[in-house]
Amino acid sequence: MSINIDIKKITDLLNSSILFPDDLQELLREKYIVLERKSNGTPTVAHIYKTMARFDNKSIYRIAKFLFMNRPDVIKLLFLEDVEPLLPYKSINISINNTEYPQLEGPIGTKIALLELFNAFRTGISEPIPYYYLPLRKDINNIVTK
């Protein structure tokens, strides 16, 4: 009996950041999640935090700095240059992000950046939490069923 295993195919499959059922279940149990998205809005990475993003202790700004770390135009638009990024407890890759982001500038760019930021905060559980944490299930179901 011969088993034909293509190591390159298996390696490519594992490197393509597949969302496994265990990862999905873990996300649905997490309370504070921040989604990083492609330019078309598809989630690419779910960053898990152990504490809530808050305005009073400025953690929401630190999370935003981490979220837009690779997009200096957005950091400049949102006045986050002097803020230290807050690293997540854990990050789970959902899909591959190989797209370029458009350069954002001016009032329209600021509105787009804020819209992206406010749509990033998600929760996997149904406990009472601040209004800016939206349910995660819709985004995850869209990714899994594609």
Curated annotation (Swiss-Prot):
Keywords: Late protein, Virion. The keyword Transmembrane helix does not apply. The keyword NAD does not apply. InterPro entries: Pox_D2 (IPR006791). Disulfide bonds: none annotated. Its main location: virion. It is found in: Virion. GO terms for cellular component: virion component. Induction: Expressed in the late phase of the viral replicative cycle. Belongs to the orthopoxvirus OPG114 family. Part of a complex composed of the kinase OPG054, OPG092, OPG100, OPG114, OPG115, OPG142 and OPG157. Late protein which is part of a large complex required for early virion morphogenesis. This complex participates in the formation of virosomes and the incorporation of virosomal contents into nascent immature virions. This is Core protein OPG114. It comes from Monkeypox virus.
